[in-house]
Amino acid sequence: MAEEKKEYKEPRSLNNDITTHVRFQNRCDRNATLYWLNFKGNLVRYSILKKGEYIDMITYVTHPWCAKEVVTNDRLVIDKEPVYYPSEGEEETYRLVLIDIPVYSLRERCKQVIWKSFPDIDPKTLDIPRLLTKELDTKKSVSYTNYKGFRHT
């Protein structure tokens, strides 16, 4: 019997008429960039939130959101998920969803500390495993467009 291949689809917005009210609040010690994933799955930057700040959004239940740390582009979680899909809520009531730091793997955390501690050093000069050197050599970059009402506090 042939194995059925499941096609993985990148998160993206789908057309939908069901609106929902969401309050995105940054609970972590890092500044967070809030992104909406548009209909092509591309990131659209909506806001930068400092610790404790929030933004109220009227969005759709089929519109996914994600957050990244402003400087390093490290993944953050929204409501404990790497990609947040709003749920249908009570009309006019904003549902609080928190932006937090996830539990990173030891490898990922080591890379974060090295990037932060030695931002201008060539990773090949460090006494670390070669595989880690290759991973560190690739800086994280994020491609996005700004929402026309982009908010930076």
Q: Which residues does each PLM region occupy?
A:
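Short, charge-rich amphipathic alpha-helices with coiled-coil/heptad character
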Residues: 1-7
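A short, solvent-exposed beta-strand micro-motif common in secreted/extracellular proteins
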Residues: 52, 61-71
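Short, acidic Ser/Thr/Gly-rich low-complexity loop/linker segments typical of extracellular
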Residues: 43-51
